Amino acid sequence: MAYKILDTCVSCGACAAECPVDAISQGDTQFVIDADTCIDCGNCANVCPVGAPVQE
């Protein structure tokens, strides 16, 4: 199961910087995770100041 980013995302970019497989990119209004690339490491959730990345 991959992670997804909730609407509480503040677009700070902390998650994208920590993703070892570059699965996170800036979307139209917030960052998004490519579920096919995500390896479920949890780095994004660990660094997010608002807890936006959650496991699907």
UniProtKB/Swiss-Prot annotation:
UniProt xrefs under InterPro entries: 4Fe4S_Fe-S-bd, 4Fe4S_Fe_S_CS, 7Fe_ferredoxin, PSI_iron-sulfur_center
Gene Ontology MF: a single term: metal ion binding
GO CC entries: cytoplasm
Entry keywords, A to Z: 4Fe-4S, Electron transport, Iron, Iron-sulfur, Metal-binding, Repeat, Transport
Cofactor(s) this protein requires: [4Fe-4S] cluster
SUPFAM superfamilies documented for this protein: 4Fe-4S ferredoxins
Positions contributing to [4Fe-4S] cluster 2 binding: C19, C38, C41, C44
Binding residues annotated for [4Fe-4S] cluster 1, in chain numbering: C9, C12, C15, C48
Protein name in UniProt: Ferredoxin
Source organism of this protein record: Clostridium perfringens (strain 13 / Type A)
